[in-house]
Amino acid sequence: MRSYLLAALLSITLFSSFTTKKNEQQTLVYNSKIQTEINRDSIIEYAKKYLDVPYKYASSDPKKGFDCSGFVNYVFKYFDISLPRSSGAYKNIGKAKSPEEFKVGDILVFYGYKNRKSIGHVGIICEANGMKSKFIHASSGKIKSVTISALDSNHYSNRFYKCINVLPK
């Protein structure tokens, strides 16, 4: 009788150990799957949730509104990517890409509309097609909200400074 009880306890212990390890492996697979889902398209999908949020100077709060760098900073922060909070700070980060290299999720950097010596605007490419790409950004212009614009419009193509990749390789 004692040996049956010992065998039963041993069986339960072994069975529960295998079950725990199986669950741990499933959790690891699940977590690695989540990590692979953070890609360029998911960044744009997340950014588009904020379309029509009003423009608000010096803000990175979706409840109050965004300015351009606040919007870019907020979107990438969700994916644990730290970026400058000021559009001017983008002048010295990243290596400029040629239009053929533009990808969804890259950041477009623009001169100010009054001054071609300083950086005044940033946005995120949401449709990559070289200088005909489209980008999502917080616009202080007529629209005064998060919107999608064409890079090849006169307003933006004339102010274009560079395109950079900020995503890990």
Question: How would you label these PLM feature ranges?
Answer:
Residues 116-117:
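Short glycine-rich, flexible loops that bind phosphorylated cofactors or substrates
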